[in-house]
């Protein structure tokens, strides 16, 4: 499986169970240290999906994926290396 397909599957798999997770979250449950990470992930995911119809997802899905990715990293005890690895892996 090539890297492009792996990234696509990764982004799609972030949507699994997204509705219950997304709607259970409190609006202010993500603290300030993760807000900039959300913006970074949103930008990287958009870069990954914007040029190819095969990768295009609607805005709500992108916001949900961004939030879930942020929460996933947040749950890894704010491990800087895990954060950098995730960002590098999602990056085009």
UniProtKB/Swiss-Prot annotation:
Name of this protein: Non-structural protein 6
Lineage: Viruses, Riboviria, Orthornavirae, Duplornaviricota, Resentoviricetes
Subcellular location per the Swiss-Prot or TrEMBL entry: Host cytoplasm; Host mitochondrion
Organism domain of life: Viruses
Pfam families reported in the protein's UniProt record: Rota_NS6
Family annotation (InterPro entries): Rotavirus_NSP6 (IPR006950)
Self-association state and partner proteins as the record states: Interacts with NSP2 and NSP5.
Family: Belongs to the rotavirus A NSP6 family.
GO CC aspect terms: host cell mitochondrion
Keyword terms of this UniProt record: Host cytoplasm, Host mitochondrion
């Amino acid at each position: 499986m090539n890297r492009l397909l792996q990234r696509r599957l990764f982004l799609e798999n972030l949507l699994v169970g997204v509705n219950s997770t997304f709607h259970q979250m409190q609006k202010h449950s993500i603290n300030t240290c993760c807000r900039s990470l959300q913006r970074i992930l949103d930008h990287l995911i958009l870069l990954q999906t914007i040029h190819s119809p095969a990768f295009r997802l609607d805005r709500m899905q992108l916001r949900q994926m961004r939030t879930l990715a942020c929460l996933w990293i947040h749950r890894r005890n704010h491990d800087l290396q895990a954060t950098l690895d995730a960002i590098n892996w999602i990056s085009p």
